[in-house]
A protein has these predicted regions:
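Extracytoplasmic and endomembrane cell-envelope/extracellular-matrix remodeling and assembly machinery
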Residues: 1-41
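Intrinsically disordered, low-complexity segments enriched in Gly and acidic/Ser/Thr residues
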Residues: 45-46, 50-57, 61-66, 70-86
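Solenoid-like repeat scaffolds
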Residues: 2-11, 39-49, 78-88, 117-125
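Single-residue signature of alpha-solenoid repeat helices
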Residues: 34, 71-72, 111
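Inter-repeat boundary and helix-capping residues of tandem alpha-helical solenoids
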Residues: 11, 18, 47-52, 69, ...
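TPR/TPR-like (Sel1-like) alpha-helical repeat modules
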Residues: 1, 77-80, 96, 106-126, ...
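Structural motif corresponding to the intra-repeat A-B loop/turn of tetratricopeptide repeats
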Residues: 28, 65-67, 105
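"A position-specific structural signal for the A-helix of alpha-solenoid helical repeats
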Residues: 16-20, 55-64, 90-100, 130-139
Length: 143
């Protein structure tokens, strides 16, 4: 049973169809097609209620396509800025992804800050799993 889908259905929340298509392309490993699909949209007009998801998905795609870390971090940061007070997982997952990038770059203070930022957000989908990854990251870098 997909608990998130059930919760969204009970709230009458329906994601933007273009973002759903992009997610399916990404999940299927069609990263170039996903990038082309999401890049063809005017975000201000078409995505006003979905900024956090838009920036999160764009950053994930760019990460798979080996874009520059700086650009990926900027996109994840936009997701955090737009969704930090949302019940969606995009902002905390974006904070986690930024932390992992900084950890890989051995920027451990920045990584710790983003692991903590992730942990400071609550009441979102997949919270336990995302928080566990952030806690594990803190343990790794603080040892």
């Amino acid at each position: 049973e997909d608990k998130v889908a059930l919760k969204d259905a009970n709230k009458n929340y329906i994601t933007h169809s273009r973002l759903l298509k992009t997610r399916l392309l990404y999940d299927g490993g069609y990263y170039e097609k996903a990038l082309l699909d999401i890049s063809g949209v005017k975000i201000i007009k078409d995505y006003s209620g979905f900024y956090d998801e838009y920036w999160y998905r764009l950053a994930r795609i760019k990460s798979k396509l080996n874009y520059d870390d700086k650009e990926i971090i900027e996109n994840f940061q936009l997701s955090i800025d737009q969704g930090k007070n949302s019940a969606n997982y995009y902002a905390p997952m974006s904070a986690l992804q930024i932390a992992l990038i900084y950890e890989k770059q051995n920027e451990l203070v920045k990584a710790a800050n983003y692991f903590e930022k992730c942990l400071s957000m609550s009441d979102f989908d997949y919270e336990r799993g995302i928080h566990q990854k952030a806690k594990s990251g803190l343990v790794r870098i603080l040892d």
